[in-house]
Swiss-Prot record:
<keyword id="KW-0812">Transmembrane</keyword>
<keyword id="KW-1133">Transmembrane helix</keyword>
<feature type="region of interest" description="Disordered">
    <location>
        <begin position="524"/>
        <end position="549"/>
    </location>
</feature>
<feature type="transmembrane region" description="Helical">
    <location>
        <begin position="208"/>
        <end position="228"/>
    </location>
</feature>
<feature type="compositionally biased region" description="Low complexity">
    <location>
        <begin position="574"/>
        <end position="606"/>
    </location>
</feature>
<feature type="region of interest" description="Disordered">
    <location>
        <begin position="363"/>
        <end position="409"/>
    </location>
</feature>
<comment type="function">
    <text>Receptor for the BAP3 pheromone, a prenylated mating factor.</text>
</comment>
<feature type="compositionally biased region" description="Low complexity">
    <location>
        <begin position="376"/>
        <end position="391"/>
    </location>
</feature>
<feature type="transmembrane region" description="Helical">
    <location>
        <begin position="70"/>
        <end position="90"/>
    </location>
</feature>
<protein>
    <recommendedName>
        <fullName>Pheromone B alpha 3 receptor</fullName>
    </recommendedName>
</protein>
<dbReference type="InterPro" id="IPR000481">
    <property type="entry name" value="GPCR_Pheromne_B_alpha_rcpt"/>
</dbReference>
<keyword id="KW-0807">Transducer</keyword>
<feature type="region of interest" description="Disordered">
    <location>
        <begin position="481"/>
        <end position="509"/>
    </location>
</feature>
<dbReference type="GO" id="GO:0005886">
    <property type="term" value="C:plasma membrane"/>
</dbReference>
<feature type="transmembrane region" description="Helical">
    <location>
        <begin position="8"/>
        <end position="28"/>
    </location>
</feature>
<dbReference type="InterPro" id="IPR001499">
    <property type="entry name" value="GPCR_STE3"/>
</dbReference>
<keyword id="KW-0472">Membrane</keyword>
Length: 626
């Protein structure tokens, strides 16, 4: 009788055998014993089923009795080996969720491996040996399936054979519930604990939990189904003695497919049993075969193979950029069509013509690099809002970034240098980066205090729109304030220098001319001069990042102080005696620009909400060569 699952089943069985062993080397290096035992049992099950489906295709002849003796014992061990491996994984995750120290010394690691080996190896071997008690004869051969254990259906069989996969699954389920409870109870300590462990991350923890729970959801229902099927499909014989059970033990029963496929329940039971190993292998590879550590090892293996064969290493490192699509300049120009006062061509012509496209070789860039020199004749300025303490609009300032965020990668597009940071990519270098600096500039035509951007750089990969320094004074530049071109040759006196303090400046319809959706600006202690020179380098402070509220980035219009003279406010800030003031929306500033710069359209909350899409939440900072 033709096998409806051929050649699909042998193909999946062989793929499962290969894929289950692919992640084994780096899991061995990480001493993940429970996961390694899971891979070994899955690979053995797939190999066993692959051989059986090939050798006994369309026949039930006893052509390989020795292999059948080995095959049925692999099947017996697999029925408890997979649940036992899942139990070890869940047990380890439970101890981690309780924020217990993961073993670090060699003796502690060996102790954990020995315990897992007792559960995943010794217990299945004992289980296999116990099957001799209820084994009625050597084995059965099913056409298109292969060798199958022959178990005598007695009450002892349920205690010795059928009940153990279900019991192990129940214990795993208990550990799963306890692990979830502890995970919810100790979330903060749990996160800090995983960050201190180099071999386990939050992503790997969740994937291990998902794998163990998925396997548990497969084996427990299957074990219950086997028990119900054996209780209802065949009569339960009374237990007499071991000698009576082993009467004519040497025989081999052979069943053509037309016989065993005549019962629908038997077909379902046999197919579920033999598909268990390939499905487990596919699930395991889906959880771990595409993770970051897996891709890194694939790249290393490819490089090793190329060196061994004398071939050029085409893929030596992981790709850090996606396939090239529409450029940023084209997207930006399309978005700027609605701004009648903005000319993309005029704006981009003001930038250096030395820009190049580094998109395809971003990984070759290493910080620090020299800061660009800025002409003193023009710059960008912004309205200043009221002085505030440690919060913005009632929201606590987010903390500075940590080493979890990589150093920026330079990309030159249409004369604009943009720095893009990739979230939590530890492969990238992380030397000190440049801060964004701004100098205190002259008054503009609206008699408002402004900052003159002398130079621009990147401090580090911050969440959107906030920068920090070690000074306790907090000031900010309004998000959505109108940025115009300022002339340094004005005869108006400059205000005193401000301390180097945190400020934030998000993009608006006009500030988008900097091609920056989350620009960072810091007031500088340096006075405005014609030759600004290079800016100093400072290390970024450490601390966990946290995103600001969207209202800080998109919902704030330009503000203007009322009831006090602007110059008096500046003096108060310099002396540290400034008092809180009431702010109100400020009118759009009038452009003071060279002939090449056009007037800037007023920015309102409505325009921003209509014109700008949501900013991605990945931390990014940008750098503009002004």
């Amino acid at each position: 009788m033709l096998d409806p699952t051929y050649p699909l089943f042998p193909t999946f069985a062989f793929l499962g055998f290969v894929l289950a062993l692919v992640p084994l080397p780096w899991h061995l290096q990480a001493w993940n014993s429970g996961t390694c035992f899971f891979m070994v049992w899955t690979a053995l099950g797939c190999l066993n089923q692959f051989v059986n489906s090939i050798v006994w295709k369309d026949n039930a002849i006893n052509s390989a009795p020795i292999w059948c003796e080995i095959s049925i014992r692999i099947t017996m061990g697999l029925s408890v080996g997979l649940p036992a491996s899942s139990l070890c994984i869940i047990r380890r995750l439970y101890h981690i969720a309780k924020v217990r120290a993961v073993s670090h010394t060699r003796a502690e690691k060996m102790r954990v491996i020995i315990i897992d080996a007792l559960i995943c190896v010794l217990f299945p071997l004992v289980y296999i040996a116990m099957q001799y008690i209820v084994q009625g004869h050597r084995f059965n051969i099913l056409e298109n399936v292969g060798c199958y254990p022959a178990v005598f259906n007695t009450p002892v069989t349920y205690v010795v054979s059928y009940i153990w996969p279900v019991l192990i699954g129940m214990v795993s389920a208990t550990y799963s519930v306890l692990a979830l409870i502890e995970f919810n109870r100790h979330r903060l300590q749990f996160s800090q604990f995983l960050h201190s462990n180099s071999t386990l991350s939050v992503s790997r923890y969740l994937r291990l939990m998902a794998l163990a729970m998925t396997e548990m959801c497969c084996t427990v229902p299957l074990g219950i189904f086997v028990i119900v099927l054996n209780c209802t499909s065949t009569p339960i014989e009374p237990w007499v003695s071991l000698k009576a059970t082993h009467y004519w033990y040497s025989r081999v029963d052979q069943y053509p497919a037309v016989v065993w496929r005549s019962s629908h329940l038997v077909v379902v039971c046999n197919e579920l049993t033999r598909w268990l190993a390939p499905v487990s292998a596919m699930l395991f590879f889906a959880y771990f075969g595409f993770a970051q550590e897996a891709r890194r090892n694939y790249a290393a293996a490819w490089a090793w193979a190329c060196r061994a064969l004398g071939l050029p290493e085409r893929i030596a490192t992981l790709p850090t950029t996606k396939s090239k699509g529409p450029g940023f300049a084209e997207k930006f120009a399309a978005k700027a069509k609605g701004l009648s006062s903005f000319n993309v061509k005029d704006f981009t012509s003001e930038f250096s013509s030395k820009a190049h496209d580094f998109t395809s070789k971003a990984k070759q860039y290493t910080l620090p690099r020299p800061m660009p020199q800025t002409p003193s004749s023009s710059g960008f300025s912004s309205s200043e809002s009221t002085r505030f303490g440690s919060s913005v609009d009632g929201k606590e300032l987010p903390s500075p970034t940590t080493k979890e965020f990589s150093s920026p990668i330079p990309i030159h597009l249409s004369g604009m240098q943009t720095l893009v940071s990739f979230d939590s990519n530890k492969d990238l270098p992380s030397p000190p980066a440049y801060d964004v600096e701004a100098q205190y500039g002259p008054y503009n035509i609206d008699n408002r205090v402004s900052y003159h951007i002398a130079d621009a750089g990147v401090r580090a990969s911050y969440p959107m729109g906030v920068a920090y320094s070690s000074d306790s004074e907090h000031r900010r530049i309004n998000p959505h304030a109108t940025f115009t071109s300022a002339n340094n040759d004005t005869d108006e006196p400059t205000s005193p220098a401000l301390p180097d303090t945190p400020s934030s400046c998000s993009s608006s319809a006009t500030f988008s001319t900097l091609q920056s959706r989350d620009f960072i600006v810091l007031p500088s202690t340096t006075d405005v001069t014609r030759d600004t020179g290079s800016l100093p380098i400072r290390r970024s402070p450490a601390g966990p990042p946290r995103l600001p509220s969207l209202s800080q980035l998109f919902g704030i219009s330009s503000m203007r102080a009322e009831g006090r003279d602007v110059e008096a406010q500046v003096q108060d800030v310099a002396t540290g005696t400034a008092a809180p003031t009431t702010t109100a929306p400020a009118p759009a500033s009038t452009t003071i620009a060279p002939a090449t710069t056009t007037a800037t359209a007023p920015t309102t909350t409505a325009n921003i909400q209509r014109g700008e899409p949501d900013v991605p939440t990945s931390p990014r900072t940008h750098r503009a060569s002004v």
